[in-house]
Amino acid sequence: MKKFLVAIDQGTTSSRAILFSLSGKPIYTSQKEFTQYFPKDGWVEHNPNEIWSTVRKVLTDVIVKSKKLKGKILTIGITNQRETTILWDKKSGKHVYLSLIHI
């Protein structure tokens, strides 16, 4: 059975998952863009639900690909939007507003 690593890159314009061999060779990439909102000049916002949806989609894509290659994913690494802020409602678990990217 082949063994793989996965990197999830949740960036400011898209979510991407990359399937790597153990030697670090990229085997397969899935990428999905999401909507950018510009409420004011110089501001950028994202919908947290859309971010989560795109991450789930690209991760599912690489999992399916690894199974087609008769492989097993050993580990997952994650990178994200360092500067992004999301406020969550403690009781509902839902976001209060769109995520704030650049102000």
Enumerate the language-model features and the residues they cover.
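N-terminal glycine/serine-rich phosphate-binding loop of ATP-dependent small-molecule kinases
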Residues: 1-97
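Conserved small/polar residues in nucleotide/adenosyl-binding loops
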Residues: 101-103
